[in-house]
Structure formats: C-alpha cells, structure tokens
C-alpha cells in the first residue's frame, strides 16, 4: 500500500473479498500494544521526547534451548497503511494466518507494526503538524528494530516480509542486520533510489499539498480539500490494475461511481500532513550499494501490472544477481494480480512463500 487512497482501495477490496467468500479463518486473536521509545533521534537531527510505536501481534514467541526466539515473523505495511490494515485484510491474513496456513498464528509469532507517521503510532496529526520531525525510511526501520528487540524481546526472526514501503524496508533489514533472520520476502518494490516516474508521482503529490493555500504551511485547521482531491486522483492511477478495473467497472457509469466513492472515502480518512510526510519519507531510500551484504535467502516478488514498479525497466532482474541467495519472481498479469496492490493478495504469491519457508531457516517446525 502506498498512500491512504491506496489503503482505502485495499479496504474496499477487503470488503469485496469478504463478500466473495474469503472470510477470515478462526485462529488466535490479535494483541495490540504500544512501545514508547524515549528521546528518539531522527536522521534529520531532530528528536522526539517520546516516540510511540503501535503494533499488532498474533500467537506466542517460542524459544529454543539457548533462549532464542525461533518462530517470529515481522510483517511491514506500505505507505499510508498500518499493521492493522494487513491484519484485517481477508486477502492477506485470511490466506496466511489461519489454521494450517503458511503463517499459522498458532505456530508463528506474527509482528505487524505501525510505522512512524502511520496508524496509531506517533504522527504529525497527533498535534505537532508540520513541526513533527522529518522522518525517513532509516528512522522507520530503526524504530521497527527497537520495537522487535527492546519492546518485544525478539532476537531472531524466522521471516522478514513487507509490502510496498515495507518491501523496501525488507531490503534494509537484510542489509542492517543480515544474520538476524532466516529469510526475507520483499513484495512490490525495487531496490534502487526512487527516480523516474516513481519519483515524479510522489513529487506531484507533495507539490499538490504544499501549493494549496489551505495547507497554510501545515498549520491548517480544516483539511486542504483541493490538495487531497488531487492526491487521491494521482494515487488511484498509481495503484491501478487495468484488467481488474475493466472487469469491475465495465461501463462509464460504473467508473464514475467508483471514483466518487473512492474520493469520498479518501477525504474522510486522510490528514494532509500525515500524507505529505509519508510520501516524502522515501526521499533518500537506496539500498543498491549494499545488496551484497544480504545473506539470508530472499524471495522477491513483483507483478507485471504494477504501475509503480514497471517490469519493462528490468531493475529487479539485474539487482537480484547481487544478492547471494536471491530469487526474483515476476508474476504475469492474470486473474489474481491487482496492480501494485498484488502485494496484499496472498493468493497470487503464497506458493513462492511456501518455497521460501521450505528452503530456509530451521529444519524443525516452530
């Protein structure tokens, strides 16, 4: 998920999935909590007296004879999303977390954080507005690591995986703590500096917010609605899946009605500063120089209908060669792909997750 408009699209898809029979299977109930990090220092030089990181977990950590956790799985969301979004999405958790499924929550300890600026974690809309520290991906990954190690006392991860922004964070985890995990699964991203069209649409969203007089330098009382309307339009296109959209909106009236509903939902859910910060946080992402530091088996999955990571660039095919145990899979366009949002539809890629789990990590089941 890349922004709250895409998060809204995923939520809409979740409702569709539920009505189509993808009900959430019974399993352990989630536990939610908050981890406070005091005097958090950001890459920008700013500090926050207390950074709140919200999280959702399923299951119970299990330890080996030496006391190391053997069954923890870290799952990271996309820009504008949250761990709760993934936990509540039938096409994701409903395909993975239930009894007998690949990440059965009765066997694994599943950790789904809300990143800085997202969900119920500390964010600009809590009250600081544009005075909130200018966080970036390095800050977010550091906070994730401190949650896992200091907050939840997990010293080893069976699997690190993430969608979109979380996909990019997955590469950073593999580089920063290469021996901490048994396997990595980045879903829907590339491992280079964000440039070209991928940078352009982000710049367009940032400019739309900052150039709206109603934004008032971030100190608005009422949301800058024209800015949010433009951002919503851009992200709908960025997250588009032509075949799925044609199927679900076969007439002009269908398309017009969809746009109106998507815009209404987006405007109701979104704070402009939160959106601005979230989109801008990718500004210095570039793991390309350290891909060779990744030692855990890595299964990298993109889809051929992803507007944000277009397959014709061939970036992943070249980069995966730099990863010692890296495998790249490009999913062909089909009934189970949903553009960039394919990352949330586990039915499209869970067979590759099964392969990764079988080929990596402890040989005994958790």
Cite the ranges covered by each PLM segment.
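Conserved hydrolase catalytic core segment
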Residues: 155-196
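Alpha/beta-hydrolase-fold enzymes
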Residues: 180-265
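Conserved alpha/beta-hydrolase "acid-adjacent" motif
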Residues: 307-314
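Short beta-strand/loop motif that positions the catalytic acidic residue
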Residues: 294, 300-302
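Conserved acidic catalytic loop of the alpha/beta-hydrolase fold
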Residues: 138-158
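Catalytic active-site module of serine/aspartate enzymes centered on a nucleophile-bearing elbow/loop
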Residues: 325-366
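Active-site nucleophile elbow and catalytic-triad environment of alpha/beta-hydrolase enzymes
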Residues: 261, 274-290
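N-terminal cap/lid subdomain of alpha/beta-hydrolase-fold enzymes
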Residues: 56-126
């Amino acid at each position: 998920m890349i922004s709250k408009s895409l998060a809204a699209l995923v939520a809409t898809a979740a409702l569709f999935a539920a009505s189509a029979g993808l009900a959430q299977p019974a399993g352990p109930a989630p536990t939610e909590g908050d981890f406070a990090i005091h005097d958090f220092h950001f890459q920008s030089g700013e500090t926050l007296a207390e950074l709140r990181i919200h999280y959702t977990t399923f299951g119970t950590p299990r330890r080996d004879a030496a006391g190391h956790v053997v069954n923890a799985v870290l799952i990271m969301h996309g820009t504008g999303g949250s761990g709760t979004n993934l936990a509540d999405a039938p096409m994701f958790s409903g395909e993975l977390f239930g009894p007998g499924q690949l990440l059965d929550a009765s066997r694994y300890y599943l950790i789904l954080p809300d990143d800085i600026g997202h969900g119920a974690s500390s964010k600009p809309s809590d009250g600081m507005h544009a005075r909130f520290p200018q966080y970036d991906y390095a800050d977010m990954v550091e906070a994730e690591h401190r949650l896992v190690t200091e907050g939840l006392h997990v010293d080893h991860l069976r699997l690190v995986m993430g969608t979109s922004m979380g996909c990019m964070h997955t590469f950073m985890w593999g580089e920063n703590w290469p021996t901490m995990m048994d396997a990595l699964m980045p879903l829907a991203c590339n491992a280079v500096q964000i440039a070209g069209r991928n940078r352009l649409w982000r710049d367009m969203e940032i400019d739309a917010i900052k150039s709206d007089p109603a934004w008032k330098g971030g100190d608005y009382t009422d949301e800058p609605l024209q800015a949010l309307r433009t951002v919503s339009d851009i992200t709908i296109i960025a997250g588009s899946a032509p075949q799925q959209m044609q199927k679900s909106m076969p007439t002009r009236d269908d398309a017009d009605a969809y746009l109106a509903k998507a815009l209404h939902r987006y405007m109701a859910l979104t704070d402009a500063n939160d959106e601005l910060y979230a989109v801008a946080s990718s500004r210095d992402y570039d793991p390309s120089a350290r891909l060779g530091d990744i030692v855990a088996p890595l299964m990298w999955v993109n889809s051929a209908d992803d507007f944000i990571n277009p397959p014709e660039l061939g970036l992943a095919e070249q980069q995966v060669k730099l990863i010692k145990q890296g495998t790249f899979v490009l999913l062909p366009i089909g009934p189970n792909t949903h553009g960039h949002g394919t990352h949330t539809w586990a039915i499209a890629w869970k067979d590759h997750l099964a392969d990764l789990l079988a080929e990596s990590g402890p040989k005994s089941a958790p």
